[in-house]
Amino acid sequence: KQYSQDSITIETMVDVENFFPNSLGSLEQFNWAVTHESARERLRFFLDECLCLFGTFQDAIDQNDSILFHSLLAPYLNSGLLDPMECIVDAISEYKKPGERIPLNSLEGFVRQILGWREFIRGVYWDNMPQYKESNFWSHEKSLTSSWYDGTTGIPPLDDAIKDSLEHGYTHHINRLMIISNMMNLTGITPNDTYKWFMEMYVDSSDW
């Protein structure tokens, strides 16, 4: 789905180019909703076109497709354009429609991503901050190198995920969790560097 860019969005993009000329990523592929109405359209598109196969492919990775059947709703949830319960209620309503078009594993997977992961972790965040941000359970001490910022680590799935993140300001949760975060942990990258990288890379990054 393509979103039209209003005057405020265009002005903001010009400001970003002028004031942050050396920032990560690119605005060439910018295609995100900036209003509640447009975010609702994205939710509707996901429910109509993607939810039916989300359960089967929710943990898949594809070198040539970073979207697959994912909802792309995280930026709208984190910015307040959509409410988590709003998305859950709409998904359940879609599941209950006659015809059994939406399989249970798709509904469960989507609801779990919002309620069982996002909202649970948000609760952990509020219950443990600010000390949680300074914790370092594994005592990691290594810093990120430039290859983590341009996708030249030499590890194909990791480089693919990094380059995808740079191009779109987004990559799905399996790339983030199972590939990027996992490799940062296995190579001993400090939590502060990890946090900084994720905050710099994604359109849905924001402190709660």
Language-model features: locations:
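Glycine/tryptophan-enriched, flexible segments
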Residues: 1-110
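Active-site-proximal binding-pocket segments
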Residues: 72, 77, 82-208
